[in-house]
Curated annotation (Swiss-Prot):
This is Sporulation-specific protein 15. Residues 90-102 have a biased composition (Polar residues). One of its GO terms (biological process) is ascospore-type prospore-specific spindle pole body remodeling. One of its GO terms (cellular component) is mitotic spindle pole body. The keyword Iron-sulfur does not apply. Residues 1-102 are annotated as: Disordered. It comes from the Eukaryota.
Length: 1957
């Protein structure tokens, strides 16, 4: 329909355009001669005849007449070309001059198609065109009418020529009867016009008919498409049926193979039967040879007779047996058709059993025969010759038995071959199973993974066994080390608390980091998961610890029982030695376990990755398992359906099975009867053999009697013997007769049974027929069940393979289970023992915990006592000072000191002992230093990123060594003090005398001292107890030192490994040198403080030493009074020394602790700072993202505006183009009109000249001239009318031209406005693009800065995590020592209180500074508010500026020159500056001042912009500083416990920064206020420039001064900013250092977490593997049950499969039905071909009708039209007749081609194009038909194809001829078209000549009355349209006929494809 509408629209357009072109041509009949094209060549007949006519008519004409004819022809050419040009322009084709118009050119057909718009017309079938419309008839009618018109025009032309001749002949010049001629011409013209209009109406009707025909054709095409869809559905159904037929064919072939194999087995059985019968015959022949005597000849004859009868009976029985066997074979064949291979195999097995039974019976019969032979031997012993013969016969008989055995062996070999066949079938089944085993590969992989996991479990079990052995060995060690375990538990608790704190910190950091990046969130989630796993692992570790404790308690109980059992001390000593060895071994194992754990930790990452891979594989396996379960569910549903069907089948089969059982019982009876008959036949054969032997004996005896009568006696004896034998044989014969009678009876019974069985067989055959029908019905469902059976069989094979694999796995698992059970029993026993031991250990542990709690309480009390002692010591020091002064006075007079000097010597000895003790302690300190070095090495090895920290630690170690040196120096000082004491003792001896004098005074004071000493004694007792406890602790420490020494060896090996790691980490240490420098500075400060503290401590120790010495002196003096005080004095001295040492150690530990606390606090503060920095960065990121989003929104808005503006511009351009095209068309029309007017004027001039020449001739008489004058006047009037019409048309065109010009002006105005708007929009776009580029640049810079900051932050974070990790490792190692000495740290509370006071003071200062910061923040807020106000003011200023701009716009509109200048400057400067410039240009006198003000304005604007940018930069710096202030605040809040120096520096920096910020903000405020005032003043001055000239100059001067001041201030602000940036860089470096520390710490935390995760994952793997073992056991049981079920299901499915083969027969019936359906389809196709033939008959009739019509037209033309005009168009009519003849021939050829034989190829000719899918499906169908129909189908099909190929070749030839003739017909139509155009041009030229002639008559003839005559006006008729329509219809018919050629090529392709099948 779309094509129709397009064609209809084209025709309507043609109508309108042709009408307009004709109007224009009527107004302007002439056209320029430059557009002239060559004339077309007319056909042969027409050109020749015209030439002849020209020769005959030109005999009496002059040369002048020929010139006039040439002029007329030129005018015709002009008119033809004008019409063609107009038609070309109206149809839209501008290249009409390029197209040739010759009728014989090959491109004219395409030209007509393009010109007429025929390519858009719909493709129609020739059938529909010829049946539904008589187009050819109508075309011929139209052509005949056109020919009549041409004829009439020819007559007119001849009349005109004759009139011209008469005018030219001077001899026969007469006056023309003008009135008659004019009336004649007018009548003719009116007739022609009426005829022409009638023909136009007829052409219009024909076009309408064409449209209806095309609509009908469209409907038919739609119906045809529906038919195609139906055909495709039929094809799909056929394909499905053929696929089912394929499957049935395959099953039939399989059944045929089975039948062949069964026939082979039957043939082998028959061969065995024949062999047995041949053996029976040989036995009969041997029996016939046994005849001996003549007397027995009668008997023998009787026996022979009997044997013959028996043989006849046997033959009859053989026949019966053969009949039975045939019936049985038929029955077996029925069974073979009904039963499957399994039933046949069962039959074969039954036959084998029967044959085995028959062989057994034959053996029994052979045994009986042997017994009979033995009897014969016994009877014939007398006759030795007979015995030899009998022995030979026996040997031959044995050989025969051997041959029978050989035949049996052969039969067995046949059976073995059949077994091989069965094996081959089974091998095929196994191959199918192997093909399906690939699907079970995944299960095998799972099993391998399970085995791998089982191996791992075994390894873990071995490890557990080793650990349990270690636990058993370490049971005694646990007793000794319970205290150590308690301490370690405490350490673990501390570590757990620290870990919890670190977790809290990490959680806080994670919560802050989650807001930054999603990736970090994911990592933190992973960390949280790891932490949860750690918690789970810790819980599991706690459970394991509890279990271990329980085991240790059990072990302790066991050890106690063992100790109770052990009686002797020798055994105890041996056990101790063994325990020591076990301890050493256990320590070694522990070291190894530690190494293994480390290796496990190192390998954990790889295990983690493998675990992830396993998880992925597990997920994949789960997905596969789900798919398998889905498949199993589907199969289960299918099995349920099959079971339902099976139930139905079983119901039917139950009846069949009953009948089969009855038949089988009958067959068994028949087989038994056959066996008995066979036995009897064998007996008869044996008897016949015996008879034959006897006959041979008789024959021999007779011969012997003939030759020897002498031996008659002996022969008689022999005869007697033979008679006895004969009697025995008769008895046997009687027995045989009885047996034969019995056999006959049995045979009668069997015959009756056979009759019954035959009846049963008939009944069964009827049942079998019903069953076959049922089976045919069942075979319909077989197709659906085959797929299910295949899937079930595949599943069965898979499950069977799985069953086999699982059985093997079950066996292995059962073996492993047995092993595991034994191991588990052993382990359970061990576990029971361990549980008992652990319970005992737990009890002990509880007791020890209670003891530890008590000891803690005692420690608390001791700490309190120590505090009291210190206070008392201080008091004692003050008292001792007083006492020393008193003793100095009393020493001179004290006599008793002589005795005490000896005691001093003893004291010296004790001091020497103490010196030795100090040496030992020094050695212990060295050992401790070595341990510390080892620990430091371990720390170096563990902390991979703290290489420089090792150097710091080494420096600390050197400091410790220096401290040891200082201690050694203190020892030397003690020695010097001892020397001094000796010197003092000498002095004391000198002062004794002085002391004696003061003894009385001392005694008074002694009482007070005794009281104080008593107090001291009490304190010393308490201290002694404490010292005892400390000694126990020291012993424990020594034991621990021994353990540590053993561990140092392990650590040394680890240290070597760690050195390698440190060598790798040295590369990363270069990045951390900056961090370590900062740390070294802090460490140096701390070391300086430590040195100060050490100096103070040395002073204190010296004081303590002095006090100790003085106390020793006092105690010596008191011991002189009381000897008991000496011991206490010694204890005090020792205690003081211990206190010194322990105070030193405590000081060292406190220093280390303080350092670690400081470092931890620094790390925490750094973490908080980093968190705050991250939050700040996140805020910045969010702000920047918001700004970027806003900018993107702005950009999107701008882009939308750009798109909108571009659309508007496009619309404007389109309008402009359309208007320009209209303008060009109008200009062309104008030019055409002018050219036509020029042509008219030229033709008029020529015509006037010719008339004047006629008038001036002398040969013309006066009346002729008068007549000519009258005619001239008459024609002039008509010509004036024509000129009036042309003038009117010209005026109309001029009006149109003016309108177009007006439109053009409007468009020009629009274009100017749009150009102006476009320039403005372009300027705005450029601005927006610049802004967009600036935004993009800023965005890129910000993104780069953000990326750099994020990278720096991540790097810092990584470094901080590494530092934290290293610090945590050091912390974990130092916390052990801190935990040991935590009870003693309370002594330093006084110092801590002092520090707290200092810290409180610092806190107060910090709070004050915070208040200052808050004030500064308030100032910043106020500054921001002022900035916002400033921005508001700026916005108000901008509004004022906008108002000024509006004012200036008004002024600019007044002066166009100023507007041009403004528009020229508008691209480079702002609108404000341009408007100011235009305002300045107004002022002539103030141009200079105004230019200066403009320059100042620009400078101020630039400065304002710079100030705004600076303000923005300052705002950004303020915001950054605010963020940094907040960050520093948080840092300072976290760093309350840091050093004073850092706090002071930071506070000073903050104060400086705040001051600078305040100064900057104040400066910015001042600048903003000043600039705002300046802007306001400047704007006011600009507004009043015309009125206030003098004020402008003064204000400009002031503004210059202020600008200079502002520039200076801005420079100062920039300098301050540079200083701030340097300070900020320093702060950033500090932050980077802290972030690096934090990164190192975070890396250490990650390693710890990874280790914990590894432990957790290992434990989870152990649990998972244990669960997998249990699940495997469950799976084994389930698989076994499943295998049993599957075996049952397999047996059932086999039974089902046996029943389903019966459906094949039904499918064969279906195949027959399909064959019949295909034949029916074939017939339907043939009928369709016949219908097409009938349609061709209708076509023939239509052609005949058209021929008749043509004949009638010819007759009418001959009757109506004279010969002269017929000759012009007769050639065209002949060509058309020839083409119609060709059409008839083509239709005959098509009719012949439609008479096709039956075949499948005609079905595919309906499609218009070759579809490969259709051909492929057709090939498949042909192949299926070949498979179904056999080899004959191919032959028939090839014959059909050959016929088709031959016929289609003939068709091709006819089509080729037809196509050539169609082209010729198209050319002839083109020639007709050209001739018609020429005729139209001729008619127009004739009308013009007639009008000119009329004007001449009016002018020249006085009698002529123009009013009485009808004025001639050129009729405006649509002649060209009707002609085009006729041509269009012709070409449409040609197109339809060409479709036949296309279909012919398509048919050829189809036939070629079919021939390739």
């Amino acid at each position: 329909m779309s094509n129709q509408s397009s064609s209809g629209s084209n025709t309507s357009d043609l109508d309108e355009e042709s009408a307009s072109s004709l109007v224009s041509s009527a107004a302007s009949p002439f056209i320029d001669s430059d557009l002239e094209t060559p004339r077309p060549n007319i056909s042969r007949a027409s050109t020749g005849q015209l030439a002849e006519d020209g020769d005959t008519s030109s005999q009496h004409e002059d040369s002048s007449e020929e010139l006039k004819r040439q002029e007329v022809r030129g005018m015709r050419r002009h008119s033809d070309l004008s019409i063609d040009a107009k038609l070309g322009s109206s149809e839209g084709s501008t290249a009409s001059s390029a197209l040739p118009l010759t009728p014989r050119s090959p491109s004219n057909a395409s030209w007509l198609l393009v010109r007429g718009g025929l390519l858009d017309s719909p493709i129609l079938d020739i059938n529909s065109v010829t049946q539904k419309s008589n187009l050819l008839n109508e075309l011929k009618q139209v052509r005949s009418k056109l020919a009549a018109l041409e004829h009439e025009n020819g007559i007119l032309s001849l009349q005109l020529s004759s009139s011209n001749k008469k005018d030219k002949n001077t001899s026969s010049v007469t006056t023309l009867t003008s009135e008659e001629d004019v009336s004649y011409f007018q009548k003719k013209l009116t007739n022609m016009e009426s005829n022409f209009s009638a023909k136009q109406s007829e052409a219009y009707d024909l076009s309408r008919q064409l449209l209806t025909v095309t609509e009908k054709l469209d409907k038919k095409e739609k119906d045809y498409e529906k038919i195609k869809e139906d055909v495709s559905s039929i094809k799909a159904s056929l394909a499905e049926e053929q696929a089912s037929n394929k499957s049935l064919r395959g099953e039939q072939e399989r059944l045929e193979k089975l039948l062949v194999s069964s026939n082979k087995t039957v043939s082998t059985l028959r061969q065995t039967e024949n062999s047995l019968r041949a053996e029976c015959k040989t036995l009969q022949e041997k029996l016939e040879k046994c005849a001996i005597n003549e007397e027995d000849s009668k008997l023998l004859e009787e026996l022979k007779h009997n044997v013959a009868n028996y043989s006849d009976a046997i033959v009859h029985k053989d026949k019966l047996i053969e009949d039975l066997s045939t019936r049985i074979s038929e029955f077996d064949n029925l069974k073979s058709e009904r039963d499957t291979l399994s039933i046949k195999n069962e039959k074969l097995e039954k036959l084998l059993r029967n044959t085995i039974g028959s062989l057994k019976d034959s053996r029994t019969s052979n045994s009986q025969l042997e017994e009979e032979m033995v009897e014969l031997k016994e009877s014939n012993r007398t006759i030795h010759s007979q015995l030899t013969d009998a022995e030979s016969k026996l040997s031959s008989f044995e050989q025969e038995n051997k041959s029978l055995k050989g035949s049996i062996d052969e039969y067995q070999n046949n059976l073995s071959s059949k077994d091989k066949m069965v094996k081959q079938v089974s091998s095929q089944l196994e191959e199918a199973r192997s093909s399906l085993a690939h699907a079970t590969g995944k299960l095998a992989e799972i099993n391998s993974e399970r085995d791998f996991q089982n191996k791992k479990i075994k390894d873990f079990e071995k490890i557990e066994q080793d650990l349990r052995a270690c636990l058993n060995s370490s049971s005694n060690e646990l007793k000794e080390k319970s205290a150590l375990i308690d301490k370690k538990d405490q350490e673990l608790n501390n570590l757990r608390e620290q870990i919890k704190e670190q977790k809290k910190v990490s959680e806080s950091t994670q919560s802050s980091l989650q807001s930054l990046q999603r990736d970090i969130l994911n990592e933190k989630k992973k960390h949280e998961v790891y932490e949860s796993q750690l918690n789970e692992l810790k819980g599991e570790l706690q459970t394991e610890i509890s279990n271990s404790e329980h085991l240790s308690s059990q072990l302790s109980t066991l050890a106690a029982e063992k100790e109770a059992a052990v009686a002797t001390n020798n055994e105890l000593s041996e056990s101790k030695n063994s325990l020591q060895t076990l301890c050493n071994a256990f320590q070694e194992k522990l070291a190894k376990s530690v190494m293994q754990l480390k290796e496990n930790e190192q390998n954990f990452s790889s295990l983690d990755t493998s675990f992830k891979k396993l998880n992925e594989s597990h997920q994949e396996l789960e997905n596969n398992h789900q798919t398998i379960t889905k498949q199993l569910k589907d199969t289960s549903s299918k099995l349920q359906q099959l079971q339902l069907e099976r139930a139905n089948f079983e119901q039917k089969e139950s009846t069949l099975s009953d009948e089969n059982n009855d038949l089988r019982t009958k067959l068994l009876k028949l087989e038994e009867s056959n066996k008995s008959l066979i036995k009897k036949q064998e007996d008869v054969d044996s008897l016949e053999k015996n008879i034959q032997t006897l006959k041979e004996d008789l024959r021999k005896s007779e011969e012997a009697l003939r030759f020897s009568k002498l031996e008659a006696k002996n022969l008689r004896e022999v005869i007697d013997n033979l008679k006895g034998k004969h009697e025995t044989l008769e008895a046997q014969r009687n027995d045989l007769h009885s047996s034969l009678s019995d056999a006959k009876n049995t045979n009668a019974i069997l015959s009756s049974e056979l009759t019954k069985s035959s009846e049963d067989v008939k009944r069964l055959t009827a049942n079998v027929e019903t069953l076959t029908q049922d089976s045919k019905a069942m075979k319909q469902s077989f197709t659906s069940l085959v797929n299910s059976y295949q899937s079930i069989s595949n599943l069965y094979h898979e499950l069977r393979d799985d069953h086999v694999n699982m059985q093997s796995q079950n066996n292995t698992l059962l073996e492993s289970e047995s092993k595991l059970k034994t191991d588990c029993e052993n382990l359970t026993q061990q576990n029971m023992t361990l549980i008992d031991n652990v319970q005992k250990l737990m009890h002990k542990h509880v007791n020890q915990e209670s003891k530890v709690s008590e000891l803690k309480e005692v420690n608390g009390k001791l700490s309190l006592d120590l505090k009291n002692l210190r206070s008392s010591l201080n008091v004692a020091i003050s008292d001792n000072d007083q006492i020393l002064t008193q003793l100095a006075e009393l020493s001179k007079n004290y006599d008793s000191l002589e005795q005490e000097s000896a005691q001093l010597n003893s004291g010296l000895k004790s001091l020497e002992a103490e010196k030795q003790l100090l040496h030992t302690e020094n050695e212990e300190l060295h050992i401790r230093l070595d341990k510390l070095t080892g620990k430091l090495k371990i720390e170096e090895s563990k902390s991979s990123d703290l290489g420089k920290k090792l150097t710091a630690r080494q420096e600390e170690i050197s400091n410790l060594k220096e401290e040891n040196m200082s201690q050694s120096q203190a020892i030397t000082s003690v020695k010097s003090k001892l020397d001094e004491t000796l010197s003092k003792s000498s002095k004391l001896e000198a002062d004794i005398e002085h002391l004696k004098n003061k003894v009385s005074e001392v005694e008074v004071e002694r009482n007070a001292l005794l009281a104080s000493n008593e107090r001291l004694m009490d304190d010393l007792k308490n201290n002694g107890e404490n010292i005892a406890s400390l000694q126990t602790e020291i012993e424990k420490k020594r034991a621990e030192n021994d353990d540590l020494q053993s561990k140092l060896s392990v650590v040394s090996s680890e240290y070597e490994n760690l050195l390698l790691i440190s060598s790798q980490t040295n590369k990363s240490l270069e990045d951390k040198t900056n961090q370590l420098k900062y740390i070294e500075k802090n460490v140096q400060k701390l070391l300086d403080e430590k040195d100060q503290r050490n100096v103070e401590l040395e002073e204190l120790t010296s004081k303590y030493g002095k006090l100790g010495e003085e106390n020793a002196q006092i105690k010596d003096e008191l011991l002189a009074l009381r000897k008991k005080s000496k011991k206490q004095h010694d204890l005090c001295a020792n205690f003081v020394d211990d206190l010194k040492e322990k105070s030193d150690a405590l000081e060292q530990l406190t220093n280390e602790k303080n350092e670690l606390i400081v470092s931890l606090e620094q790390s925490n503060s750094n973490n908080e700072a980093l968190v705050e920095e991250r939050s700040d960065l996140a805020n910045r990121l969010s702000d920047m993202k918001k700004s970027l989003s806003d900018s993107d929104n702005v950009i999107s808005v701008i882009r939308s505006d750009l798109v909108r503006v571009n659309d508007e511009l496009d619309t404007l351009k389109k309008d402009k183009d359309s208007l320009s095209t209209q303008y060009s068309e109008v200009c062309q029309d104008r030019d055409d009109l002018l050219d036509s007017l020029k042509g008219c004027e030229e033709s008029f001039n020529k015509y006037a000249v010719s008339l004047r020449e006629l008038c001036t001739k002398s040969e013309i008489d006066v009346p002729v001239s008068e007549i000519l004058d009258d005619n001239f006047v008459f024609n002039a009037g008509n010509f004036s009318e024509l000129s009036r019409l042309t003038v009117l048309s010209l005026e109309n065109y001029l009006d149109a031209f003016n309108q177009v010009n007006f439109k053009k002006m409007e468009l020009d105005n629009r274009l100017t406005t749009t150009d102006a708007e476009f320039t403005k929009v372009v300027a705005d776009l450029e601005k927006l693009q610049h802004e967009h580029d600036d935004w993009l640049i800023q965005r890129g810079d910000l993104e780069k800065a953000l990326k750099d900051s994020e990278k720096n932050f991540l790097r810092k974070e990584a470094e901080m995590t590494e530092n934290i990790h290293s610090l945590e490792e050091g912390k974990e190692e130092t916390k052990k020592e801190i935990a040991e000495l935590s009870s003693r740290l309370e002594d330093n509370q006084l110092a801590t209180n002092k520090l707290k006071n200092q810290l409180d003071h610092l806190n107060q200062e910090i709070r004050l500074k915070e208040d200052v910061l808050k004030e500064k923040e308030s100032l910043i807020i106020s500054l921001e508010e002022s900035l916002s106000n400033q921005r508001q003011k700026e916005s108000s200023l901008l509004d004022a500026k906008n108002e000024l701009e509006h004012m200036l716009d008004d002024t600019s509109r007044k002066n166009s020159s100023l507007m041009e200048k403004i528009e020229s400057i508008n691209s480079s400067l702002d609108d404000k500056s341009f408007e100011l410039a235009s305002a300045v240009e107004k002022l002539g006198a103030l141009q200079k001042l105004h230019s200066e003000s403009l320059s100042l304005m620009e400078n101020i604007k630039s400065q304002l912009q710079e100030a705004k940018e600076k303000i923005q930069v300052d705002e950004s710096t303020i915001q950054e500083l605010d963020h940094e202030i907040t960050a520093s605040k948080n840092n300072y809040e976290g760093k309350l416990n840091d050093k004073d120096s850092i706090i002071r520096d930071l506070s000073e920096n903050i104060e400086q920064l705040n001051n600078l910020l305040a100064e900057e903000k104040s400066a910015v405020k001042r600048l903003s206020t000043e600039k705002e005032s300046e802007i306001l003043q400047f704007n006011s001055r600009l507004a009043d420039l015309e009125y206030h000239k003098s004020q402008v100059e003064s204000e400009l001067g002031r503004s210059k001064l202020k600008l200079a001041s502002t520039t200076e201030e801005l420079q100062l602000a920039e300098n301050e900013r540079l200083s701030l940036t340097t300070r900020m860089l320093d702060l950033q470096n500090q932050v980077k250092d802290l972030s690096n520390i934090k990164d190192s710490l975070s890396e250490d935390l990650r390693t710890l977490r990874s280790l914990e995760d590894s432990v957790a994952s290992l434990q989870k793997e152990c649990k998972i593997k244990s669960n997998t073992v249990e699940s495997l056991q469950d799976v084994l049981t389930s698989v076994q049950a499943r295998n049993a079920e599957l075996e049952d299901e397999v047996s059932r499915s086999v039974d089902k499969i046996r029943r389903r083969d019966d459906r094949c027969e039904h499918l064969s019936g279906k195949l027959k039905k399909l064959h019949s359906q295909l034949e029916e389809q074939h017939e339907t196709f043939f009928r369709a071909e016949q219908q097409r033939m009938t349609q061709l008959g209708f076509l023939k009739e239509t052609v005949k009708k058209q021929e008749k019509l043509l004949k009638k037209l010819n007759l009418r033309q001959e009757q109506l039209i004279p010969r002269s005009s017929i000759l012009v168009y007769e050639s065209y009519i002949r060509d058309i007749e020839k083409e119609i003849i060709v059409l008839q021939e083509r239709l005959n050829g098509i009719e012949l081609s439609q008479q096709l034989p039956k075949g499948y190829f005609g079905y595919f000719f309906k499609t218009n194009r070759v579809e490969m899918e259709v051909l492929d499906s057709f090939k498949q169908q042909v192949a299926k038909l070949q498979f179904l129909a056999g080899a004959e189908f191919i032959v028939k099909f090839k014959e059909d194809l050959e016929k088709c190929a031959a016929e289609e070749k003939e068709k091709q030839a006819t089509f080729d001829n037809y196509s050539e003739k169609v082209e010729n017909l198209g050319k002839s139509i083109e020639a007709l078209y050209f001739a018609l155009n020429r005729e139209i041009s001729f008619r127009k030229s004739l009308a013009l000549s007639k009008s000119a002639y009329h004007n001449l008559l009016v002018r020249d003839s006085p009698k002529f009355n123009p009013d009485s005559q009808i004025t001639y006006s050129i009729p405006v008729t649509n002649t060209k349209q009707s002609l085009l329509r006729s041509a269009i219809l012709c070409v449409i018919s040609l197109q339809r006929l060409r479709l036949l050629g296309q279909r012919h090529s398509f048919c050829e392709e189809v036939i070629e494809n079919l021939s390739c099948v």
